[in-house]
């Protein structure tokens, strides 16, 4: 059968097609900065840029219908203000000597975070500090002769740094009972224990910080937030800018943005998005997803009697994020205790991701490095298998090593977020497992992404400052940016570890602005009084 298309109908169809193309073209907007991901990293970078270049236009694209719903959500992370006060993996022992360099680096980074948060409070960007940060003592808690020996050596080594002067050490059951009564009830009085206790630790709600950041940014005329929008494609324009296409998951509409600078702070999704951009620098990376679950209690009779983040020591071959800890938390306005994490496995790169994430991120460039790491890190593989096979009874028995009188009926299991451990190509070893965070940038600095996990959100402010140094090097060196950065971070360019007087000054300043009670002097441990029984719950 012959089909005849009338000229008028053909012209109408052509006009419609042209109109659709024009509409699609109209949907492509131009901005100075496009941020993919609505978590703590992207929002921190946006706040930095708002301070340094308030005239720049910015757009944030988030796949979910709210910001801070993946890794930044308080329920999906441990909420620790990582300062290396209790985390034993930051002080490895080499040839009989404790190396504190990484611990000092982590602590210095958190001092930058404290100053950045304090500045945002002063500017009215953040409100009510107790809604997002609270004083919570950090404790290392170990048993067994080898672990006790290690902890004592660690304590002695850290005393060389003014950053760790408030730390106290004890093997005395009665003293430990004063600090953490819940952990001592029902414990064998003859069990050898050792702890370090640092009252100046913090519990941080990174989700709340993110929500307040974005809420403020939305009041700015040059900031636009796109929720329920998933990035579909990333391509390079002829002028060197980036063309990002995304789809609204609610109504199916599509849009695109051209950006002079593109930042990918999408948590576990950062790796596949960097790969999508086609930059050579992303080809050297692979990722292995590791999830975590926690036992949780909100029973006030229990939660009110523990005021610490008590960290143990990781099992052989276990990743740093697996270090068991019994934590005081404040989430959704309620005081809780979380214990874990227990490693879980899923091929998803995000808690609300796809089971195809791992497969989709595997390429000819990173497959061999991933295989090599799998063979060489067999202890890690065995650890993950053992964790996945754990029963509820196994997890509860692990809890009872920290809280001997725990009762099953008071606790529930909560599935927290996903983390993607970095695997990087290595010429000598084929591939290496990178435990930490890593900034990946293109050669010309027009695109950057953040990969990795711990210490993560605790160091968002210094990490984003590092991003600025990499992609806007000349701007950072300019007198205008230098002056503003030093106004926000008074210790910028100074190692506080080498300047005790400056450290004292910054601690007093941030304690006051962030309302971290009791006011603490890092140089005078005797001025520190243990947190009282009301603790965070009274706030």
UniProtKB/Swiss-Prot annotation:
Cysteine disulfide partners in this protein: none
Family: Belongs to the MQO family.
NCBIfam families attached to this UniProt entry: mal_quin_oxido, PRK05257.1-1, PRK05257.1-4, PRK05257.2-1, PRK05257.3-2, PRK13339.1
UniProt cross-references to Pfam families, sorted A to Z: Mqo
GO biological process: tricarboxylic acid cycle
Region feature (Disordered): 516-539
Any GO molecular function: 2-hydroxyglutarate dehydrogenase activity
Catalytic activity: (S)-malate + a quinone = a quinol + oxaloacetate
Essential cofactor(s): FAD
Keyword terms of this UniProt record: FAD, Flavoprotein, Oxidoreductase, Tricarboxylic acid cycle
Protein name: Probable malate:quinone oxidoreductase 3
Pathway in which this enzyme or protein is active: Carbohydrate metabolism; tricarboxylic acid cycle; oxaloacetate from (S)-malate (quinone route): step 1/1
InterPro entries (alphabetical): FAD/NAD-bd_sf, MQO
EC nos: 1.1.5.4
């Amino acid at each position: 059968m012959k089909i005849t298309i009338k000229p008028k109908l053909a012209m109408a169809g052509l006009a419609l097609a042209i109109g659709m193309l024009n509409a699609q073209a109209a949907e492509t907007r131009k901005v100075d900065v496009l941020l993919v991901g609505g978590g703590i990293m992207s929002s921190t970078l946006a706040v930095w840029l708002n301070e340094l270049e308030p005239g720049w236009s910015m757009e944030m694209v988030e796949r979910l219908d709210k910001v801070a719903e993946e890794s930044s959500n308080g329920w999906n992370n441990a909420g620790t203000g990582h300062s290396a006060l209790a985390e034993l993996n930051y002080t490895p022992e080499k040839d009989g000597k404790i190396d504190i360099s990484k611990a000092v680096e982590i602590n210095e980074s958190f001092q930058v975070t404290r100053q950045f948060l304090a500045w945002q409070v002063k500017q009215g960007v953040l409100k009510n500090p107790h809604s997002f940060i609270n004083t919570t003592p950090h404790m290392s808690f170990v048993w067994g002769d080898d672990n006790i020996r290690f902890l004592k050596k660690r304590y002695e080594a850290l005393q060389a740094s003014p950053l760790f002067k408030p730390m106290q050490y004890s093997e005395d059951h009665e003293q430990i009972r004063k600090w953490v009564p819940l952990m001592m009830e029902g414990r064998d009085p003859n069990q050898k224990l050792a702890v370090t206790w640092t009252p100046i630790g913090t519990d941080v709600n990174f989700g709340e910080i993110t929500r307040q950041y974005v809420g403020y940014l939305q009041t700015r005329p040059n900031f636009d937030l796109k929720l329920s929008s998933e990035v579909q494609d990333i391509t390079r324009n002829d002028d060197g800018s980036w063309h990002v296409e995304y789809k609204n998951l609610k109504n199916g509409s599509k849009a695109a943005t051209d950006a002079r600078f593109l930042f990918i702070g999408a948590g576990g999704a950062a790796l596949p998005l960097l790969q999508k951009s086609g930059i050579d620098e992303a080809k050297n990376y692979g990722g292995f997803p590791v999830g975590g679950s926690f036992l949780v209690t909100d029973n006030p009779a229990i939660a009110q009697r523990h005021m610490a983040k008590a960290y143990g020591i990781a099992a052989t071959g276990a990743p740093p994020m697996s270090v068991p800890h019994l934590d005081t938390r404040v989430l959704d306005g309620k005081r809780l205790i979380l214990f874990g994490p227990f490693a879980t496995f899923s091929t998803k790169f995000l808690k609300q991701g796809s089971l195809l994430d791992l497969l989709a991120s595997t390429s000819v460039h990173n497959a061999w490095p991933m295989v090599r790491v799998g063979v060489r890190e067999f202890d890690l593989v065995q650890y993950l298998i053992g964790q996945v096979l754990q029963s509820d009874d196994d997890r509860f028995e692990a809890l009872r090593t920290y809280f001997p009188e725990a009762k099953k009926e008071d606790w529930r299991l909560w599935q927290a977020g996903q983390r993607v451990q970095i695997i990087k190509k290595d010429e000598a070893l084929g591939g290496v497992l990178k435990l930490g965070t890593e900034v990946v940038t293109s050669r010309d600095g027009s695109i950057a992404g953040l990969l990795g996990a711990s210490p993560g959100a605790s160091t968002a402010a210094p990490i984003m400052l590092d991003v600025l140094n990499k992609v806007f090097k000349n701007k950072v060196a300019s007198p205008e940016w230098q002056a503003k950065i030093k106004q926000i971070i008074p210790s910028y360019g100074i190692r506080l570890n080498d300047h005790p007087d400056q450290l004292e000054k910054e601690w007093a300043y941030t304690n006051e602005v962030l309302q971290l009670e009791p006011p603490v002097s890092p140089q005078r441990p005797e001025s520190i009084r243990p947190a009282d029984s009301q603790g965070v719950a009274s706030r």
